[in-house]
Structure formats: C-alpha cells, structure tokens
C-alpha cells in the first residue's frame, strides 16, 4: 500500500463506519405506531359507529381464552379495540402486547377459523403463532392472512352484548374470493376522542 492511498482508504473506512452507524437500530427513528381502530368500511347495522376488531371482555375481565369479535366501535380508544399495524404484518393490541392470531394447526388456518388474541410471535405446544399472525392489507380493503387466500371477515348476523346498546358479530377467516365485501373490507381509523381505558 502506498502512502498516497492510505488517506483514501482511511476516509473510505470512516464513511463505511458512518453508514453502519446510520443503519443501526439505535439511530433509526423510534416513533411508535399510533394506535387506532381496525374498522369495517361498511357500517352494516351500526350506521352511527360501525364494527371494530375487539378482544372479548372489558377492563380487568379481558378474555384472551375466547375468540375475538367484531364489536360496535366504542367512542374513543379503549384498550380492547386499540390496535397498531406493525410493518411486518402484526395487528397488535399495545395495551396487552397481544396480536390478532388465526386459530390453526401446523402454521395453517382453514376457512372459518376463529381469531384469537395471543402473544406476538408465541411458540408453545400446538401454537406456532408466527405464520398465523402475519397479515397483508390489500388495496381493496381486505386483510389477508399472509399467503393463505383467507381474509378477515365479520359474521352475517349481529346480536346484543350484555348491554342492549351494543352489538357484536363473529370474526373469522373466509376465502378472500368469496367473502362478502361489506363484511371483509377494513380501514384503519384513529378516533377523535381518545379514551384509553383498560
């Protein structure tokens, strides 16, 4: 190596180190995603508030052991309906650090599979959640379990909850090509009034 190339190589090394530092997660922007509702575009029988992805229960009575539902969207942002959409496909409930998960076996869900809230990336007996938690948001508003051809769909019927003022519908996966568009097209919305109740 000649003395004339040493400054060039030293400068190149400094530039490479600077580039690596910029690419480091420590230097990446760390703004957390904003929570909001995953809401059906069509309001169905709830013209005043529509239906949102919901974990069954309320307050200290959240039921992670039961299937998720499409529940009429609550005013503001309650913990059991507040989700963030992660870049790699998780639909995460930040208050509980749980992710929307298709009920399935061997990493595969079938049409009609329920949705449950499980630990993000969970690996436990009979639950390899990673492939059952990655969703793709299609341009038409459908939310597909990645690579499955199955889309998040609300049931055709609604019923009252413990309060006559509230309604719920079953929530499951249906073939994207045959799912009723009014019950399978979703949007991410941020409510104007934030409630943040647990």
Predicted regions and their residues:
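Intrinsically disordered, low-complexity segments
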Residues: 1-2, 22, 179
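Lectin-like carbohydrate-binding module/patch detector with strong preference for beta-trefoil
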Residues: 28-198
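Bacterial N-terminal signal peptides
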Residues: 13-23
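Bacterial N-terminal signal peptides that target proteins for export
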Residues: 2-15
């Amino acid at each position: 190596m000649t003395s004339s190339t040493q400054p060039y190589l030293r400068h190149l090394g400094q530039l490479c180190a600077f580039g690596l530092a910029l690419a480091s997660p420590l230097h990446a922007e760390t703004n957390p995603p904003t929570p909001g509702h995953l809401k059906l575009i069509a309001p169905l029988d709830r013209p005043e508030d529509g239906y949102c992805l919901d974990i069954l229960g309320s307050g200290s009575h959240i039921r992670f052991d039961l299937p998720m539902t499409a529940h009429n969207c609550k005013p503001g942002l309650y913990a059991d309906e507040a989700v963030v959409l992660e870049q790699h496909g998780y639909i995460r409930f930040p208050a509980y650090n749980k992710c929307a998960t298709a009920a399935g076996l061997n990493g595969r869900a079938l049409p009609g599979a329920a949705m449950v809230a499980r630990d993000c990336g969970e690996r436990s007996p009979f639950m390899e959640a990673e492939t059952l938690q990655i969703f793709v948001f299609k341009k038409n508003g459908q939310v597909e379990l990645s690579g499955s051809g199955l889309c998040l769909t609300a049931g055709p019927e609604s019923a009252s909850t413990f309060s006559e003022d509230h309604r719920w519908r079953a929530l499951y996966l249906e073939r994207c090509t045959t799912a009723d568009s009014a019950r399978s097209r979703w949007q991410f919305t941020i409510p104007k009034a934030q409630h943040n109740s647990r």
